[in-house]
């Protein structure tokens, strides 16, 4: 099966998953680039946990490759261009937060990223914990 061991679950519980779906309704290319997204709480930046954060955590937890692959499929791509009517979704991960935070998502537009930057701000996002 694809069950996660307790050590891996414990690592996951230290984090917060934000799972947006991006749908390009414009005629222009829309660029999803997670490095252009910011997270903050109380005026302080929150560092996003990139894909490269996880392999060492999984090694420490003794998580088999099959489960690592399953987890990887759930993550938002780091970079992706979206054309008219294309969508992409997945999880973006930050350290667990006890209070509300803001997510600012910036998207370049145009095939060469030379169009206007579109920005979407979500305020008051809260993590769900197991407690």
Q: Which sequence ranges carry the predicted segments?
A:
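Short, surface-exposed ligand- or partner-binding patches at beta-edge/loop junctions that are enriched
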Residues: 85-114
């Amino acid at each position: 099966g694809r069950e996660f061991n307790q050590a891996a679950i414990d690592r996951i519980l230290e984090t917060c998953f934000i799972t947006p779906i991006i749908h390009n309704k414009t005629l222009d290319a829309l660029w999803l680039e997670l490095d252009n997204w910011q997270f903050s709480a109380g005026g302080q930046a929150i560092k996003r946990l990139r894909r490269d954060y996880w392999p060492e955590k999984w090694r420490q937890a003794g998580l088999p490759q099959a489960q690592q692959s399953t987890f990887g499929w759930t993550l938002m791509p780091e970079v992706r261009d979206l054309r008219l009517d294309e969508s992409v979704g997945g999880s973006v991960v930050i350290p667990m937060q006890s209070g509300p935070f803001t997510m600012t998502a910036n998207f370049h537009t145009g095939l060469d990223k030379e169009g206007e930057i579109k920005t979407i701000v979500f305020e008051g996002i809260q993590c769900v914990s197991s407690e």
